[in-house]
Amino acid sequence: TQDRSSAASDVYKRQQLQNTLSGKKEFFKPVNPDHVRIYACGPTVYNFAHIGNARMAVVNDLLVRVLKTQYKKVTYVSNITDIDDKIIDASKETGEDISVITSKYTEIYNNDMSALGVNLPDIQPRATDHIKEMIGLIKKLIEEEKAYEKEGHVLFHVPAFENYGILSKRNRDEQIAGSR
């Protein structure tokens, strides 16, 4: 006979998740069942958290908690966007240094999420800690003609991505027509 904890574990491993691409519920099959890794976009820290920030934190935390009951090791990473036009605007408006603003609102965000009972991610990388990698990726995209520069911005060259918009179910040709 199978003990209860093992039976419960088998039930949990039959957990289904909604696949955005297929539109169907599918059984979760980790790439590596010995170490499940999850990455989720985190907040842009220029002001107090809003309900959308809290929703994502709660949903991601719930998923991580469920997975931790099923798998030996789960690592949850959620970034902190600490450089962005909104942050630059907040710095200009308040006269505060960008790092002061982002440190303050990162701490407030983490405190607010903890007050909601959300477990914080295992790792919270800051965007500014990865600027070199971003620049390298942008250069590569431009070299491969998958991105281009226009009016001080780097934009995706949508026709270079056959499946661009597939997850959002948006028509690629309409997105091309609306590009800059």
Task: Report each predicted region and the residues it spans.
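A short acidic, glycine-rich active-site loop
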Residues: 98-100
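Active-site cores that bind ATP or allylic diphosphates and position pyrophosphate for catalysis
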Residues: 126, 133-180
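A glycine-rich helix N-cap at a beta->alpha junction
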Residues: 106-118
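N-terminal catalytic cores of NTP/NDP-binding nucleotidyl/phosphoryl-transfer enzymes
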Residues: 14-89, 94-96, 124-127, 134
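Metal-cofactor-binding active-site regions of metalloenzymes
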Residues: 116, 120-123, 127-128
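Single conserved hydrophobic/aromatic residue that forms the stacking wall/gate
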Residues: 1-12
